């Protein structure tokens, strides 16, 4: 959305994000590893190749140089380094005596089954591990009662699961007693636990890791982050996000078809984005059919939204509005409270916005006769679908690198992608703050350029548009006269 609201650009969310990064030290980014790497990687046929690392490599957190390009030794604007993920030539766990556990938590997301499949097959095919266990229905599956439902994961069970959405392990929200969960891991002989879930899940993973460390048991707890909103700090992409954008574009195109097929038609599409508007912003740019884009990072009033709608109707009889679910939480009164994951319950801004648009059009019926408003909420269809091919590849890469690093003893960390490199980030740092849209960044600039702007002169813009159309007609008329003269 291209609303001219400069005072809102430096929102509290953006400030908090930058302040947090300023307080992070290199020591905070140091990845914990279980002591000892006594076993050679069993993939001996590749042992002499560079895919297997003996030492830790790093990338700069921010590749932008502080100095001018002419500087002989440019220095990054940030002193922070992130540890690169890799397969290791020597590993911590004895593969044939290693048991892997997998748990999926929180809401479902495209790619969950791909991650489960890749972890399982990497453990079996590459490392020949003793067992792979799947814990059912989130952290409940690690409780004393829930552990009775654990299932064995093998090639036959996971071969085709990537064709389907959801998770074959099931999922749930909410914490469990960490002591009870570590008891389960010890009882079943689990050496590595992969936790696939959002920030709440990973905070729970950190507690499990700390309890295991307190007991002195040799267990790696390794996170594969799942956030369809793409709001993970230190990461530029999370699995399922690209698929969500693709499906969101389909919903926007449907809303556009409804809007342009009516006299003063409005299509409203609610997309996922509790605290971050990445899906809404990218879908707006990708579809090139959105006229207003509302995201949590740029809060505006009901009056301003209706002014944007008026501005759009000054030069078109259709309007498509995209709204992220976390936008406009001060527009109405919700039920209050928090869900089992600790997230604040949101009001349904999609329904509220739709009703307010209808009321506005009804109050201005003489100006906008025969107006219609169509509302589309594709959220559950998006998160339940299988991933796109590119997302499936991304899931496989995250999962296989997670197995390689966990086998080498990395623990209390997550796998993430930054600047097209795969890195390890300690869970404590990764979950300390959400990543949000930079309202001064390139993505938001693109959104502003293609959507309605209260700061622009609509009459002048319409006049220029008509003038361009007339010039095109005149050029075509001259061409036709020339062709006619030749006959």
Curated annotation (Swiss-Prot):
Mg(2+) binds at residue 199. It comes from Trypanosoma brucei brucei. Allosterically activated by AMP. The record marks 200 as: Important for substrate specificity. Keywords: Allosteric enzyme, ATP-binding, Glycolysis, Glycosome, Kinase, Magnesium, Metal-binding, Nucleotide-binding, Peroxisome, Transferase. It comes from the Eukaryota. The keyword rRNA-binding does not apply. Pathway: Carbohydrate degradation; glycolysis; D-glyceraldehyde 3-phosphate and glycerone phosphate from D-glucose: step 3/4. It is found in: Glycosome. It holds the Pfam family PFK. PANTHER family: ATP-DEPENDENT 6-PHOSPHOFRUCTOKINASE 1. A motif (Peroxisomal targeting signal) lies at residues 485-487. The keyword Kinase applies. This is ATP-dependent 6-phosphofructokinase. Homotetramer.
């Amino acid at each position: 959305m291209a609303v001219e609201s400069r005072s809102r650009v430096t929102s509290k969310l953006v400030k908090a994000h930058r302040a947090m990064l300023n307080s992070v030290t290199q020591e905070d980014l140091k990845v914990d590893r279980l002591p000892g790497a006594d076993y050679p990687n069993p993939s001996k046929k590749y042992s002499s190749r560079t895919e297997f690392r003996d030492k830790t490599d790093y990338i700069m957190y921010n590749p932008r140089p502080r100095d001018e390009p002419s500087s002989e030794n440019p220095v990054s604007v940030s002193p922070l380094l992130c540890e690169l993920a890799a397969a290791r030539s020597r590993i911590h766990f004895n593969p044939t005596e290693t048991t892997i556990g997998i748990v999926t938590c929180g809401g479902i997301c495209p790619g969950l089954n791909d991650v489960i499949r890749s972890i399982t097959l990497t453990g079996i095919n590459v490392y020949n591990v003793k067992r792979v266990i799947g814990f059912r229905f989130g952290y409940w599956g690690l409780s004393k009662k829930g552990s009775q439902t654990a299932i064995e994961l093998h090639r036959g069970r996971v071969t085709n699961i990537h064709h389907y959405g959801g998770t074959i392990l099931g999922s749930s929200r909410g914490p469990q007693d960490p002591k009870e969960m570590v008891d389960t891991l010890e009882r079943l002989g689990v050496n590595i636990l992969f936790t696939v879930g959002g920030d709440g899940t990973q905070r729970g993973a950190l507690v499990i890791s700390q309890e295991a460390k307190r007991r002195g048991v040799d267990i790696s707890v390794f996170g594969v982050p799942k956030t369809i909103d793409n709001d993970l700090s230190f990461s530029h992409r999370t699995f399922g996000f690209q698929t969500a954008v693709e499906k969101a574009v389909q919903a926007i195109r449907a809303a556009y078809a409804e809007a342009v097929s009516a006299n003063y038609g409005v299509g409203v599409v609610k997309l996922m984005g509790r605290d971050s508007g990445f899906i809404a912003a990218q879908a707006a740019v990708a579809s090139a059919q959105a006229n207003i884009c509302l995201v949590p990072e740029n809060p505006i009033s009901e009056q301003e939204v209706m002014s944007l709608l008026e501005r759009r109707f000054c030069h078109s009889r259709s309007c498509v509005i995209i709204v992220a679910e976390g936008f406009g939480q001060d527009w109405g009164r919700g039920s209050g409270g928090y869900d089992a994951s600790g997230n604040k319950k949101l009001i349904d801004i999609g329904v509220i916005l739709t009703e307010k648009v209808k009321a506005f059009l009804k109050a201005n019926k003489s100006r906008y006769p025969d107006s219609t408003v169509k509302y589309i909420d594709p959220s559950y269809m998006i998160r339940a679908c299988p991933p796109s091919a590119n997302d499936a590849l991304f899931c496989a890469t995250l999962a296989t690198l997670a197995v390689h690093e966990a086998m080498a003893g990395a623990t209390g960390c997550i796998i993430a992608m930054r600047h097209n490199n795969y890195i390890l980030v300690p869970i404590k740092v990764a979950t300390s703050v959400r990543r949000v849209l930079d309202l001064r960044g390139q993505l938001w600039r693109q959104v502003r350029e293609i959507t309605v702007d209260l700061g622009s002169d609509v009459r002048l813009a319409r006049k220029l548009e008509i003038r361009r159309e007339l010039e095109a007609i005149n050029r075509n008329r001259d061409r036709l006269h020339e062709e006619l003269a030749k006959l």
